[in-house]
């Protein structure tokens, strides 16, 4: 079973990807990991990608698709795989179909923007230890202080409301169109169309996990 997991930053994809990977014994595949492995192995595609990256460019889709084709032939993908952060564009999704790389399931984790902003902008971190808190969901015993050391907690630049809103805009502009693309494919029902499921991403992590696994088992 090959799965693509879609959803905005902060929707909980990382947590759920781990659960899916464990439940179905399939590896998570990220383009970043594939690129690093190919460069390290000095494969033909890896060297082509390295040349582009060294020049500060974006690795073109044909190289990425080539890496995907190689990766899914490896032994650990015998049961399938879970694509993490790929495809990002409709062009990449089209290229997967053109190359005959069949996808079985699309899972969208749906969380409204305001909920994501609340989740992400409420995070606080103790820099020295990496301990994380949340002002609503997991507050420290004393506001703004680490439970163990009593030292100040900080908000990372990535977690400010302004930054989160910018990241959400990029997602809506660039990646969200994929949701419509795959939803329409499922409605059309062509032979190579993956099954599309929209999962409510608000609630207990365990319930969301069960909803996703149930959708994948249907």
Curated annotation (Swiss-Prot):
Keywords: ATP-binding, Cytoplasm, Kinase, Nucleotide biosynthesis, Nucleotide-binding, Transferase
Subcellular location: Cytoplasm
Superkingdom of origin: Bacteria
EC number: 2.7.4.3
Pathway assigned in UniProt: Purine metabolism; AMP biosynthesis via salvage pathway; AMP from ADP: step 1/1
Region NMP, annotated ranges: 30-59
Biological processes per GO annotation: AMP salvage
InterPro entries referenced in this protein's UniProt entry, alphabetically: Adenyl_kin_sub, Adenylat/UMP-CMP_kin, Adenylat_kinase_CS, Adenylate_kinase_lid-dom, P-loop_NTPase
Main location: cytoplasm
Protein's UniProt keywords contain Metal-binding: no
UniProt xrefs under SUPFAM superfamilies: P-loop containing nucleoside triphosphate hydrolases
Molecular function terms from GO: adenylate kinase activity; ATP binding
Catalytic activity, as annotated: AMP + ATP = 2 ADP
Function: Catalyzes the reversible transfer of the terminal phosphate group between ATP and AMP. Plays an important role in cellular energy homeostasis and in adenine nucleotide metabolism.
Protein name, entry field: Adenylate kinase
Species lineage: Bacteria, Pseudomonadati, Chlorobiota, Chlorobiia, Chlorobiales
Gene: adk
């Amino acid at each position: 079973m090959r799965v693509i997991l879609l959803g905005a930053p902060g929707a909980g994809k990382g947590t759920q990807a781990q659960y899916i990977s464990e439940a179905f014994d399939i590896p998570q595949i990220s383009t970043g990991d594939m690129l690093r492995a190919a460069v390290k192995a000095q494969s033909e595609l890896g060297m082509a990608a390295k040349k582009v990256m060294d020049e500060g460019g974006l690795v073109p889709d044909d190289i990425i698709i080539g890496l995907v084709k190689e990766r899914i032939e490896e032994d650990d993908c015998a049961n399938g795989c879970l694509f993490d952060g790929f495809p990002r564009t409709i062009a990449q999704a089209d290229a997967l179909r053109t190359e005959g790389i069949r996808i079985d399931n699309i899972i969208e984790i749906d969380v409204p923007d305001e909920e994501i902003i609340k989740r992400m902008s409420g995070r606080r971190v103790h820099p020295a230890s990496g301990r994380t808190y949340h002002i609503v969901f997991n507050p420290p015993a004393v506001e703004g202080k680490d439970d163990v050391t009593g030292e100040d907690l900080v908000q990372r630049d990535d977690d400010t409301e302004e930054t989160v809103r910018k990241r959400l805009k990029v997602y809506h502009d660039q990646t969200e169109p994929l949701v419509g693309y795959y939803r329409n494919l499922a409605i059309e029902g062509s032979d190579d169309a993956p099954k599309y499921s929209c999962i409510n991403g608000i609630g207990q992590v365990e319930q969301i996990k069960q909803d996703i696994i149930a959708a994948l088992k249907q």
